[in-house]
Regions:
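N-terminal secretory signal peptides that target proteins for export/translocation
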Residues: 1-2
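Bacterial N-terminal signal peptides
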Residues: 5-17
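Scaffold/interface architecture of coatomer-like assemblies
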Residues: 19-304
Length: 304
């Protein structure tokens, strides 16, 4: 074979190989899914110092690769403080105001924002989102309890809507006995809105009396399940323990972990809809010692 023929043959081979290697690849942009995770011991104290290797993350029971990891995450906080002004919580209201003011002063960093919502027969936004703890304190000071009913679920709907455009961690801190006496928004609707808007609910359950008689146990149960189903937490409180409860919420928010992942490729029939999220400890011993909390999932079209 002549040098020219050999050269042409080699060139054709290289060209064919290059074409095979350069076959078009189609990429689909998959949004990063952020999951904020709280880890506590059996006494409820936050656990810090864990690493990415300490966690396993699953979407719809399928293991995912953790692409982003932060401990004591600096992700901004957007917090709504929702206070019940109805007659059922009248006796503890002054202590609730003061404890909420201390909380805002304690927890807000330069990158954080807070808002105040008040509810009784109706619901209303009080301050608008602000990074100034003094403005939050002023808004809280201007609230006065009444004698009307409680639009509890409507307040969750309003708060979720206010938090929807905010970036970072969306947190709703509710102070109430959970006694919903105003028709309009149902429990299911309120929970669905909070999950869709990725709102973590921290429920502070006002205990009017120690005995079960005279208490709205169904309302208390609703406040507990709303917290559990959104990755938050529920606390019982009276006048003496309000400051301590707010302090525990602040500690919980300060020590959260951020786990981010790009969901693995899904079959066409799996596109869209609700995607469950589970976070576990990699070590079986840690799984037995610690409790892990995170939002239960997200709607695929709204991943953030």
């Amino acid at each position: 074979m002549s040098r020219l023929a050999a050269g042409l043959a080699l060139g054709a081979l290289l060209s064919t190989t290059a074409m095979a290697q350069q076959e078009p690849t189609f990429h689909v942009d998959v949004p990063l899914v952020n999951v904020f995770v709280s880890v506590t011991d059996k006494a409820g104290a936050p656990i810090g110092g864990l690493t990415k290797d300490d966690f396993q993350l699953f979407e719809n029971d399928k293991a995912q690769t953790i692409a982003v990891f932060e401990r004591d995450t600096s992700a901004p906080l957007a917090i709504v403080l929702a206070l019940d002004l109805s007659g059922s919580v009248y006796k503890d209201f002054a202590a609730e105001q003061q404890a909420a003011q201390h909380f805002a002063k304690d927890v807000l960093r330069p990158q954080d924002r807070a808002d105040v919502v008040a509810f009784a027969d109706g619901t209303r936004e009080v301050t608008g989102f602000t990074g100034e703890a003094k403005r939050i304190a002023s808004g809280l000071s201007g609230l006065h309890p009444g004698t009307g009913g409680t639009a509890f679920y409507s307040s969750i709907s309003l708060s979720s809507g206010l938090l929807r455009p905010e970036h970072g961690r969306r947190v709703l801190v509710m102070i109430s006995d959970g006694d919903n006496t105003v028709n309009g928004v149902s429990y299911e609707d309120a929970l669905d809105e909070a999950v869709r808007d990725e709102v973590m609910i921290y429920s502070i359950i006002d205990v009017p009396v120690a005995a079960s008689a005279g208490r709205d146990l169904a309302g208390e149960h609703a406040m507990i399940t709303l917290a559990e189903q959104t990755g938050g937490r529920a606390y019982y409180a009276d006048q003496a323990s309000l400051d301590q409860v707010f302090h525990r919420i602040a500690d919980d928010l300060r020590t959260q972990y951020l786990l981010g992942y790009y969901p693995r490729k899904r079959a066409p029939e799996e596109q869209g809809g609700f995607r469950s999220i589970a976070v576990k400890m990699s070590n079986a011993q840690n799984n037995a010692k610690y409790s892990v909390r995170n939002r239960p999932g997200y709607y695929a079209s709204a991943a953030r």
